[in-house]
From Swiss-Prot:
UniProt-annotated stretches for the region Disordered: 1-67, 212-295
Highest taxon in the source lineage: Eukaryota
Ranges annotated as biased composition (Gly residues): 38-55, 213-227, 242-267
Protein name, entry field: THO complex subunit 4C
């Protein structure tokens, strides 16, 4: 120990090199290995290699731990998706499962009569208030100028209908916007069908509106019946007046013998005859059969 204290730094380095070369030649046999905490031992003691080696103390006990051979994988930061994005993905997958392609998803609102100063940002700001937009664009002509039309595609059809009801004929930069939903009827309720029905005697002919079924028809005051509910078979009584079917009543119209002061002395002539359910069903079937013969 005293010899090491009297040696200079160069001599100590030279001696350590010679000891390491001798240990390498001997293969490290018979040399014990001391290990500390982790890769570096306590008090700077570093264990030898797999074949062992001399124990270094003092100033030369430098932590010569090699650089790590593995890299730390940074955790990939997952992009958080919004709840409505997951719902839209599920909605598109459902439509594809039933045979509807992804291009067909969404409802397009076609907008015309726009001022040339309207921009895409104006369209987005205005129509995004209604619901989620899939895409939006202003149309341009061949010269690159706005053509006065645009289209907005909503993810939900209900939003497109609401946008049409809210912004149709509304002024934007002094011009009323004209909106149209592409690819389907936009009416909330279907229009009643109108057919021409010929009466049983071949002389009576009128237009009948078939709606979504109010039970019990009604004949109005005019020659034609109004569009309120399903019209049941028109019948003729013995006095020539016109009566309605199940639950209906006869009006004051111009039916034969149906006016005021007829032979029966009442406003409607003879009262309708009570019929059973089977008779009414039979009359209804005959009415439908006659309705098919549209003249």
């Amino acid at each position: 120990m005293s010899d090491a204290l009297n040696m200079t730094l160069d001599e100590i380095v030279k001696k350590s090199k010679s000891e390491r070369s001798a240990a390498a030649r001997s293969g490290g046999k018979g040399v014990s290995r001391k290990s500390g905490r982790g890769r570096g031992g306590p008090n700077g003691v570093v264990g030898g290699g797999r074949g062992g080696g001399p124990v270094r103390r003092g100033p030369l006990a430098v932590n010569t731990r090699p650089s790590s051979s593995f890299s730390i994988n940074k955790l990939a930061r997952r992009k958080r998706s919004l709840p409505w994005q997951n719902q839209n993905d599920l909605y598109e997958e459902t439509l594809r499962a039933v045979g509807v392609s992804g291009v067909e998803v969404g409802t397009t609102v076609y907008i015309t009569n726009l001022d040339q100063g309207v921009t895409n940002e104006d369209i987005r700001e205005l129509y995004a208030e209604i619901g989620e937009l899939k895409r939006y664009a202003i149309h341009y002509d061949k010269n690159g100028r706005p053509s006065g039309s645009a289209e907005v595609v909503y993810m939900r059809r209900s939003d497109a209908i609401q946008a049409m009801r809210k912004y149709n004929n509304v002024l934007l930069d002094g011009r009323p916007m004209k909106l149209e939903i592409l690819g389907g009827n936009t009416e909330s309720a279907p229009v009643a069908a109108r057919v021409n029905v010929t009466g049983l005697n071949g002389r009576m002919k009128r237009s009948v509106f078939i709606g979504q079924g109010v039970r019990g028809g009604r004949v109005g005051r005019g020659r034609g019946s109004g569009p309120s509910g399903r019209r049941l078979p028109l019948q003729q009584n013995q006095q020539g007046g016109v009566t309605a079917g199940r639950g209906g009543f006869r009006g004051r119209g111009r039916g034969n013998g149906g006016g005021r002061g007829n032979k029966s002395g009442g406003r409607g002539g003879k009262k309708p005859v009570e019929k059973s359910a089977a008779d009414l069903d039979k009359d209804l079937e005959s009415y439908h059969a006659e309705a098919m013969n549209i003249s």
